[in-house]
């Protein structure tokens, strides 16, 4: 008796055997009845060259997708996060995300535009100037984005000295006598940089009323001029106008919700008011928002000091002293002068 696996059975009624050669012994379990030899022949049938080429092309596409998809997904995520952060005025986050996106697509004009806006609103003017130079002569299809970048470029001019101001600084070796400075300001009433520079000198000399007057004039020309808003917050604190000081900090935060220095400025106002617990909370918040700003670190040093946490205060001072940044050293020196009593920060 033959093996039943190779017999034509009632599973294929009316079948005369192998559909290819007619042999009675077929392999069951397949739609087409074939004997073992014919089925093996079909299995070993040569694949046409065209099909091989097509299959190879599909394989290459799949391999490319496997490598490029994670990169493209990452790029898309950075752009999406950066765009969302920009709409929420979280410009530190926006600058971080668009920087990562730009590293993948350095020639993408829209990414560079978003990066420029974030840098400007973070007052990272060195980064902004580099990006702005790249954008000169470029075409931007997004009209709304173009308008924002164009406005930022126009405003950037007020953050650097004009040629006439540079010449005056050269003549007096960066130590312009008061009468000469006043004459220059009268002749250049719209030179925001010069007026702010003079206001800074007045602040350092404790000439608060004329400083206040000049800063208000600056803000009439540009209500969002960051340095003037920041100095106004400090000025009003020194004048004991604490609500007004907070108002200027809020103006900064309305422009950039991640302006950590505005939060730190509020913390210093609370220290002036001897609201030390609230001051510490604000100082910690400023560090959480922007841990790289030395002003925020110096503020936290002061907050630790007035809250009696000398261990954390001294540890942070030591950490800051390892930093070679001149601005960091200047801010920390001020904080240590307050701690030692060399500078009087508030009444005892």
Q: Could you tell me what each predicted segment is?
A:
Residues 34-37, 298-299, 303-348:
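Terminal, low-structured helical/coil segments at or just beyond the last alpha-helical repeat
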Residues 68-104, 159-187, 191-204:
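Alpha-helical segment of the N-proximal tetratricopeptide repeat
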